[in-house]
Amino acid sequence: MSLSDPIANFLTSIRNGQLSMNKVVTVSYSYVIHAILQILLSEGYIDGFTEKLRSTNIKFFEVKLKYYNGVPVINRICRVSKPGKRCYCSAKGMPKFYNGLGLYIISTSKGIMSDYNARKSGVGGEILCGVF
């Protein structure tokens, strides 16, 4: 478990949980992960998530993964901007993930949002991850 990149740990937990057909995975708590989970829930990639508290007063999320006819809804989830190489884009130069079938999650000055909402708001930012 890499403590230098909690977003990559979160994405790997989701990917591994879907590949092993788990119904629920647990991920560490952070405000960025909470915002990403809200976007995944609103776009229909997960069934839901709850915030829990361990006996040692450490917060974590339980994420309910979504399947359609036994097939994971998330085909590909990947980290784009990494700690060693950041990836930024403007609102006009924002790429589309899988020709618009997937979505990028972007950290902007107005908060963390999907690429569609960032284009609509006219803001660019750091591309955190892509989901298809």
Curated annotation (Swiss-Prot):
Record-linked Gene3D superfamilies: 3.30.1370.30, 3.30.1490.10
Molecular function terms, GO-annotated: rRNA binding; structural constituent of ribosome
The record's annotation in InterPro entries points to: Ribosomal_uS8, Ribosomal_uS8_CS, Ribosomal_uS8_sf
Key words of the record: Ribonucleoprotein, Ribosomal protein, RNA-binding, rRNA-binding
Q: Which SUPFAM superfamilies match?
A: Ribosomal protein S8
Gene Ontology BP, a term:
translation
Q: Does the keyword Electron transport apply?
A: no
GO cellular-component terms in the record? Answer: ribonucleoprotein complex; ribosome
**Similarity annotation:** Belongs to the universal ribosomal protein uS8 family.
- PANTHER family linked to this entry: 40S RIBOSOMAL PROTEIN S15A (PTHR11758)
| Known role | One of the primary rRNA binding proteins, it binds directly to 16S rRNA central domain where it helps coordinate assembly of the platform of the 30S subunit.
Q: How does it assemble?
A: Part of the 30S ribosomal subunit. Contacts proteins S5 and S12.
> What is this protein's record name?
Small ribosomal subunit protein uS8
